[in-house]
From Swiss-Prot:
Belongs to the universal ribosomal protein uS11 family. GO terms for cellular component: ribonucleoprotein complex; ribosome. One of its GO terms (molecular function) is rRNA binding. One of its GO terms (biological process) is translation. The keyword Zinc does not apply. PANTHER family: 40S RIBOSOMAL PROTEIN S14/30S RIBOSOMAL PROTEIN S11. The lineage of its organism: Bacteria, Pseudomonadati, Pseudomonadota, Alphaproteobacteria, Caulobacterales. This is Small ribosomal subunit protein uS11. Keywords: Ribonucleoprotein, Ribosomal protein, RNA-binding, rRNA-binding. Located on the platform of the 30S subunit, it bridges several disparate RNA helices of the 16S rRNA. Forms part of the Shine-Dalgarno cleft in the 70S ribosome.
Length: 129
């Protein structure tokens, strides 16, 4: 007797009006996660998840596409206002912010939460190209 295929539960719509967008812009990729005030993930996207590979993931355009995607997914759950936490040294920081605004989100605060060492670990040696 064949097993009946398991039914995939449809993701229910959360009615959340405000959230927190965490933009992590590294040198290699840009990741955007939109959470509620408690930190539970509502939606996420990254340059790699949008189909960019290799060095194209670190471009501002890839960050813009990822932010638009995360913003649209969050808007389906009712998110209208966002606080933005930006971390990392990558090139996709500003373009991700502009794309979130273009997706119809109202940005209330922008915080730079990049971790800065108080002379902690020794950094990697300089590249010689």
């Amino acid at each position: 007797m064949a097993k009946e295929p398991a039914r995939v539960k449809k993701r229910e719509r959360k009615n959340i009006t405000s959230g927190v967008a965490h933009v992590n812009a590294s040198f290699n990729n840009t990741m955007i996660t939109i959470t509620d005030a408690q930190g539970n993930t509502i939606s996420w996207s990254s340059a790699g998840a949008m189909g960019f590979k290799g060095s194209r993931k670190s471009t501002p355009y890839a960050a813009q596409m990822a932010a638009e995607d995360a913003g649209k997914k969050a808007a389906e759950h009712g998110v209208k206002t966002l606080e933005v936490n930006v971390s990392g040294p990558g090139s996709g920081r500003e373009s991700a912010l502009r794309a979130l605004q273009a997706a119809g989100m109202t940005i209330t605060t922008i915080r730079d939460v990049t971790p800065i060492p108080h002379n902690g670990c020794r950094p990697p040696k300089r590249r010689r190209v």
